[in-house]
Amino acid sequence: MEAGMKLGLQLGYWGAQPPQNHAELVAAAEDAGFDTVFTAEAWGSDAYTPLAWWGSSTQRVRLGTSVIQLSARTPTACAMAALTLDHLSGGRHILGLGVSGPQVVEGWYGQRFPKPLARTREYIDIVRQVWARESPVTSAGPHYRLPLTGEGTTGLGKALKPITHPLRADIPIMLGAEGPKNVALAAEICDGWLPIFYSPRMAGMYNEWLDEGFARPGARRSREDFEICATAQVVITDDRAAAFAGIKPFLALYMGGMGAEETNFHADVYRRMGYTQVVDEVTKLFRSGRKDEAAEIIPDELVDDAVIVGDIDHVRKQMAVWEAAGVTMMVVTAGSAEQVRDLAALV
């Protein structure tokens, strides 16, 4: 794999059962020169356990979460998990965080969703305090007060430093963000952005959001050293129509079924691309139980906006378009070790 845009492998979160070939995929990614292997979590399998398990057989590839649920762990618990994996992997961990949506946050994790931007900022500040290990960790809140005081507490809480000395105080933090304010926040306080449903056609809009964050006082990074690790479905095929048909049910789920009807950040991504009418109709059909119809009405051009599907020459050219748009790492999925190797040969 030549220098330039890097590749990441997205293992995602599990379905009904653990996947059978992920150890093989991780080994193939390590051998083929992939930069990073990512795991995710929602309301089933967690991200850290499989990343540690499969990552234990690797020596080079970075091990990232894309993403862990911010509401699943307190900031200090998150920092502990991250510093532990960073030690075990010899300094190869990337912490990817996401706020999810109110249905999952309040319905599964039992946490309050409002003020996601403020919560994220406070959360990351505490995580970095833990890793810095310069003084006992404190936070004035209002979302994560440390030590916790006030009504219902004993008043005995004590500010603490982590027992374990982190291997790195600067473990990279990336943010899964879709809206303008969250993307700007990623540029301001994080080391990278983890976009889903990225479209190079919209790069100008994304750059405005990012530049707002880079321009803020005290911004952590600049354009030159900030990573954009975009998730992309890449399908090498001579039958684009069949591939599009296979992707549309997935898009219908995310546009129509993920999140509440009036609060679906994935749907908002496609609205910003100019597909408001399609999104509204997909949502209506999906939520009325007509899921097949919801997928069928999605136009090919909507699919093509945020995926790469075609023969090898087309895929290679489109990957160059994504790189020119500012993507530093394309995070892909693969069903076999052969597909991992085929993708690695394209960059």
UniProtKB/Swiss-Prot annotation:
One of its GO terms (cellular component) is plasma membrane. Its EC number is 1.-.-.-. InterPro entries: F420-G6PD/mer, F420_OxRdatse_Rv3520c_pred, Luciferase-like_dom, Luciferase-like_sf. It comes from the Bacteria. Coiled coil: none annotated. Pfam families: Bac_luciferase (PF00296). PANTHER family: 5,10-METHYLENETETRAHYDROMETHANOPTERIN REDUCTASE (PTHR43244:SF1), PTHR43244. This is Putative coenzyme F420-dependent oxidoreductase Rv3520c.
